[in-house]
Design a protein with these regions (language model features):
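Mg2+/Mn2+-dependent nuclease catalytic core
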Residues: 28-47
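A short acidic/basic microdomain associated with nuclease active sites
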Residues: 1-4
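Nucleic-acid nuclease catalytic cores
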Residues: 45-70
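Charged phosphate-binding loop/patch that engages nucleotide di/tri-phosphates or the phosphate backbone
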Residues: 77-97
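Acidic, Ser/Thr-rich peripheral helices and adjacent loops at domain boundaries
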Residues: 70-76
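Helix N-cap / beta->alpha transition motif
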Residues: 36, 63-67, 84
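Conserved catalytic cores of phosphodiester-cleaving nucleases, focusing on short active-site segments
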Residues: 11-13, 18-29
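Beta-rich catalytic cores
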Residues: 7
Length: 97
């Protein structure tokens, strides 16, 4: 958790295609995904190559930063970009390909 700049995602990544991306890491409690106002604001202001990776009891789900409002309001009923940790890693690696 970055306390210097509130809302900054947990992961600042850079792939082999020289594309920068961010990932907010979350653990779902039931069907809800808790996001702070600062985290929501970050993803609204920086929707490109910004992601939210949510760990559920069953799997991991990757959401686009542009889905942040819907994810906050509707929780896990929102359709993710991909499901699974491996699939999420492949998605990050293919940004900009």
């Amino acid at each position: 958790e970055n306390t210097s700049v509130l809302g900054t995602p947990d992961v600042l990544g850079y792939n082999s295609h020289q594309y920068f991306f961010t990932v907010e890491l979350k653990i779902a409690n039931g069907s809800k995904v808790r996001l702070s106002p600062h985290q929501i604001s970050f993803h609204i202001l920086h929707p490109k190559n910004a992601f939210i990776l949510v760990k559920t009891k069953a799997d991991c789900r990757l959401y686009s930063g542009s889905q942040v409002r819907e994810l906050f309001e509707k929780g896990l009923s929102v359709k993710p970009i991909v499901r699974g940790l491996r699939e999420s890693c492949l998605y990050f690696e293919n940004i900009g390909k």
